Amino acid sequence: MMAATKRIASGVMSTALVAVLAGCSGSGSGGSASGGAGVDTEKGAHGAKENPPAGAAPKNAIKLIGDGSTAFTGVQPKLPAAKRLAAGEKPPQFVVFSWDGAGEDSQKLFSHFRGVAKKYNAKMTYFLSGVYLLPEEKKDLYNPPQHAPGRSDIGFNDTGGIRDTLAEVRAAWLEGNEIGTHFNGHFCGADGGVGTWSVDEWKSEISQAKAFVKSWKTNTPELKGEAPLPFDYDKELIGARTPCLEGQKNMVAAARTMGFRYDSSGVGNQVWPKKKDGVWDIPLQLVPMPGRAFETLSMDYNFMVNQSGTATQGDPSQHEYWGNQMRDGLLQAFDRSYNGNRAPLIIGNHFESWNGGTYMRAIEETIAQVCTKEGVRCVSFRQLADWLDAQDPRTLAKLTTLGVGEAPKTGWSSYLGTQQAAARPADKETGTRTGTDKDTEKGSEKGQGKDQGRGQEQEQDGGEGQAPGGGAAEAPGQAPAEDAGEAPDQAPDQAPGNASGQEDAGPDPAGATG
């Protein structure tokens, strides 16, 4: 079981506005979910061709890396290839389900949602915290920026927890899912939090996150007999989400020199992503919160704080309603993209049993409803980035002019019919891509629509996670709660259709804390 601690943050309200924190999961508290295997259809998303299953690779095909904690085993299996849109073709509806601080504990939620993904032909992104592969007795190997060696706001792990997490990471990758990073110690706020780190400090944090994944056999000698992780993490790691959604600017400046191709640490609206400083900026999104006068971030923790405040186990009589509210909000968000601009829907989650596990139920029901629809692809961030890179830059430029829920007035065939689909051949394989598509980046800057600017969080020095109206969201508190998971990610909830902050129409009827 993961030995993690959690720092709970209080919500902040300015007048009638609610500043909500996006949570980050470690080991949860309460509840349990079975690790069901689901039904493996062995097909790509709605018939897309996949790389062949890896199975048991011949010994001579496995190239151990370093101490044998990781290995090169060939192209990732079960990963559909990215294809360029034909002229006039309607874009797929992408949906990304992602998990912050992914690790397997006694709740068995990692294994459970692997089964859910297989059942509904979904691929997902698991943002692994590096310290979840570092045992408590070796904690001094972690040298966090601006903190003493061995310090972590989410604790470390034990041998059993490391073994279980490795098993899930190994299986997830072989099933075509992505292993990203949530970095290490999860420090938030003004006192040495990630939002205060320099570019060089971020480079150190990224290097250490990689090192813990690449050296778990050395650091946990009891597990030397375990199979290696079947990938080269230096090549596998292409994206992240920062703790508390802080520090994005300097993190990206560091990460872009270390092979990263995307980041999901921002706050935005349901519009098509663009590149920022050569990296795809694919933020969490503001989505409807049924019955409320404002929208909330597309993450389970944000719904929870708007419902039960910072109490992770609120009124049991409200649990079912709260889960339904989250599910219905996500489904409304899906519908306005699916029937509108087809912008990818980005959803963040945590392996937690907050409010009796109601958010896990909500996510599972959402997956079941959206991933089975025609034209929908439930993909990892890697797959989404591959698809974006494969497109004609002029096509992407037109897509970015569409506002939230805005379908082309003349229809997709006419709207995208003038694009030259054969301008350059799409890459055959999604497993590896190199370099920055400068043409795509420049093309996506053209024709910015009136709604495109909505939801773009403005970076300031140490300014991520600001409350609506300019007030800073409160940093996580300092008193750890035993075995409660990670500190929450910070991000503001906004009034509908404006990620930069508008006043709520009235008091928050659900009683979110202020």
What are these regions (language model features)?
Residues 44-65, 143-159, 226-341, 392-404, ...:
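Active-site-adjacent pocket scaffolds in enzyme catalytic domains
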Residues 68-74, 78-79, 125, 262-274, ...:
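C-terminal domain-boundary segment and adjacent tail
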Residues 190-208:
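Active-site cleft segment of glycoside hydrolase catalytic domains centered on the general acid/base Glu
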Residues 177, 181-182, 282-285:
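Aromatic- and acid-rich polysaccharide-binding/catalytic face
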Residues 3-7, 11-14, 18, 24-97, ...:
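N-terminal pre-catalytic segment of deacetylase/amide-hydrolase enzymes
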Residues 43-53, 428-514:
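Ser/Thr/Gly/Pro-rich low-complexity, disordered linker/stalk segments of secreted
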Residues 61-178, 185-189, 212, 219-253, ...:
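Active-site beta->alpha N-cap acidic-glycine motif
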Residues 109-111, 158-166, 202-207, 323-332, ...:
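Well-ordered, non-membrane alpha-helical segments in soluble/globular domains
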